[in-house]
Amino acid sequence: MTETAATETTPAAPPAEPKQKKKQQPKKAAGGAKAKKPSGPSASELIVKSVSASKERGGVSLAALKKALAAGGYNVERNNSRLKLALKALVTKGTLTQVKGSGASGSFKLNKKQLETKVKAVAKKKLVAPKAKKPVAAKKKPKSPKKPKKVSAAAAKSPKKAKKPVKAAKSPKKPKAVKPKKVTKSPAKKATKPKAAKAKIAKPKIAKAKAAKGKKAAAKK
């Protein structure tokens, strides 16, 4: 009985595998769809480039556009419908002006007025962006000079303490004023003594003169 039960249970296992395969298949399909997306510039970008590169004054025709795109490696046959839709969209936006024909057929030119406005708008954005950054830098700069103000205030307070030694310099002036008075008196006394000596020296000259006169009188006699 056990063998028969084992044989009956074994065929029930295989049907579970196809369910797992069915779940995995849509994931692969999604991955394949992502890989099929075209890489590179879009049809509208290629059309604008080819029209801007052309030097024809009367505009570029649809046939000339297809030739230029095919020369650049674009598959025109597969993407013919995309090219027509892109041309119509560019005309409605105003990037291209239709010179001749209607719809996708005809000749097309770049709308220079719209290009000039776009260039001016981009230039204005570039000029406005640096102006917004300048006030932020100006606010940060005044914060740094606040610290040196504290240092200068402390330096201004410190020289006030240095004024105290001036009071100590006033005390030695008193003894200097007293000493020169005593010194001036002593030389005055010494100067009076030599006058008496001169008077004494002058007396013997008078005596010598009298003696000379007496000698002359005796000689006359």
UniProtKB/Swiss-Prot annotation:
Composition skew (Low complexity), residue ranges: 1-11, 27-44
Cellular component terms (Gene Ontology): nucleosome; nucleus
Key words of the record: Chromosome, DNA-binding, Nucleus
Listed GO MF terms: DNA binding; structural constituent of chromatin
Gene3D superfamilies per the UniProt record, alphabetical: Winged helix-like DNA-binding domain superfamily/Winged helix DNA-binding domain (1.10.10.10)
Region spans: Disordered: 1-44, 123-221
Superkingdom of origin organism: Eukaryota
Location of this chain's protein in the cell: Nucleus; Chromosome
SMART domains cross-referenced by the UniProt entry: H15
Function: Histones H1 are necessary for the condensation of nucleosome chains into higher-order structures.
Identification of the protein by name: Histone H1C
Organism: Xenopus laevis (African clawed frog)
